[in-house]
Design a protein with these regions (language model features):
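Conserved core of the sugar-phosphate nucleotidyltransferase
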Residues: 131-180
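Conserved N-terminal catalytic core of the sugar/cofactor nucleotidyltransferase
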Residues: 1-123
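The conserved acidic donor/metal-binding loop of glycosyltransferases
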Residues: 126-129
Length: 180
């Protein structure tokens, strides 16, 4: 039976191959640290302002009240494990679930089944940043929920090119906010 109390656990999917990231982009210079993460195919470990991007994701989760984090990684992702095993964590506990092969999102979530137990969990990708305010809303919702952004909001407040906005997943909600 699944608990209906506010979740304190988050599953962060960090198993992707990063195959698109491994291709060189024109006019983009990477630091040695960024190159190492790119070569390993671990997008979440690309350095931003001297810290892995995943640090910002975990910090936002902690700010929103999530205390137990499970990173779903591949067996070859020592870069992630070495980093988080080597840093002091004051606001969160980090554990790992290994997805042996990259068989998709549902399989990655399944890899974290033991971590979830009977508790509610938040599931998010390691290479997407959600503001703590959005995560707080998910923390407080009594049932299932997702974060969605309006097309207008994406156009106005993101750095995503207009032509890519149409390529994103589209969710439709009814007047009460239920997925339609």
């Amino acid at each position: 039976m699944i608990s209906h109390t506010a979740p304190h656990k988050a599953v962060v999917l960090a198993r992707g191959l990063g195959s698109r990231m491994r291709r060189a982009a024109e006019d983009v210079a990477l630091t040695a640290e960024q190159s190492r993460a790119a070569d390993a195919g671990v997008k979440a470990m690309i350095s931003l302002d001297g810290r892995p991007f995943l640090d910002f994701v975990i910090s936002a989760l902690a700010d929103a009240g999530f205390t137990d984090i499970c990173l779903v990684i591949g067996p070859e992702h020592d870069l992630i494990r070495d980093h988080y095993d080597g840093v002091t964590k004051q606001r969160v506990r980090i554990s790992y679930a290994v997805q042996a092969e990259p068989l998709g999102t549902a399989n990655a979530v399944l890899a974290a089944e033991e971590f979830a137990g009977g508790d509610r969990v938040l599931v998010l990708n390691s290479d997407n940043y959600y503001p703590a305010e959005a995560l707080e809303l998910l923390h407080e919702v009594p049932g299932s929920a997702l974060v969605g952004f309006t097309r207008e909001g994406m156009l106005k407040h993101s750095n995503i090119p207009v032509e890519r906005i149409a390529a994103f997943a589209l969710a439709t909600a009814d007047a009460e906010g239920n997925l339609a």
